[in-house]
Amino acid sequence: MSLPQVEAAVEDLRHAHRELLGVVDSLSDSDWERYVPYGDWTVKDKVAHAIGDMSPSGAGLIHAGVLTPEFIESTSRVFDVRARNASIVEERRRYTKEDLRQLLFESHDAMIEYALILNESNLPVLAYAVPMGPEYEIKVEDWLWHGYHDRQHADDIRRAVEMDWQPEKLTFLPEIDAQIGLVQRYREGLLRAIYSVADDAWDEPATPGGWTYKQDLAHIASNDLRPQTRLRAILGEAGDEETAAILRTDEWNQARVDERKGWSVRRLVDDLAANRHQTLKLLARLRPEHLSATISFASGDQVSLPDYVGHIGRHDAMHAGHLVPASRARRFAMKSQ
């Protein structure tokens, strides 16, 4: 008999997959060639990516018996999935839309098959911790809750249809570029956390007496406005009043959250993506003479500009960790106790 949490994860995946298939089926021929904000993939490329590698994925690793806490920890530190993703997309560029649609229809079959034969002997491995970044940790069991991936890319495709986007080539100083990879990795981890949140959890308090999970998302979405102010100050485009305002941290944060009251989760994620792109555009404008600038925090601490870029990514990871208790996996576990 399949494990109840695995059956729930598979049902969630099937529901998310039907949603993604519906979005793909609604595309016109010209929609497939539209670019997806804010990168350089087309909708066709995004569908090719959403298919995945057709493997059993995490469930296959569990069955293979290769997972140990040490293996997971070391792999999470060095493995960067983006190169593999780019390779898969490049290889599938020769496929027709019909080919990709068929592959997408079958894409999760192996994963589901292997997941449903997991049993109680696999419970210790499902409980292994998977470090995702500062203050952000999930479990091996969360790998089985893969519906987030289809939800995320369904929204990406919708965004491409709604926006006229053309890729922008951004280049960074080497000192900045050295931090960008980790910033992007933590952003992907944050999106995983966002699209894993249960629909009925958003309006619940993340902490007793504090913001709801949706308000926390509003803060995360708007927070890039803070580094943008600091970067514009370095570029000579922000005044003292603006830079002083962001140091009144609680007041500034609450004002940004209040401005987004009533926004849908999807609108907040759109805001999140747009704001991050604007931050990257500012980072691309930095020149060697700007590298000597220091960034001051409300605490009085100061960091170098390259270190501050790393801080932007760590903020994403920290808030992703805050969202984990609201995930579909945790909600199911809570209801099952």
Label each PLM-derived region with a short phrase.
Residues M1, A8, D12, H63-E73, ...:
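Active-site-adjacent scaffolding segments
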Residues E19-L20, V24-D31, V36-W41, L190, ...:
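Long, hydrophobic N-terminal alpha-helical segment
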Residues M1-R14, W165-Q184:
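Extreme N-terminal tail/first-helix region
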Residues F79-V125, L144, L182, Y186-Y195, ...:
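Acidic/histidine-rich alpha-helical segments that form the ligand environment
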Residues E33-D80, L123-L170, D203-E251, L280, ...:
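Short, contiguous alpha-helical
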Residues T171-Q215:
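Conserved small-residue-rich
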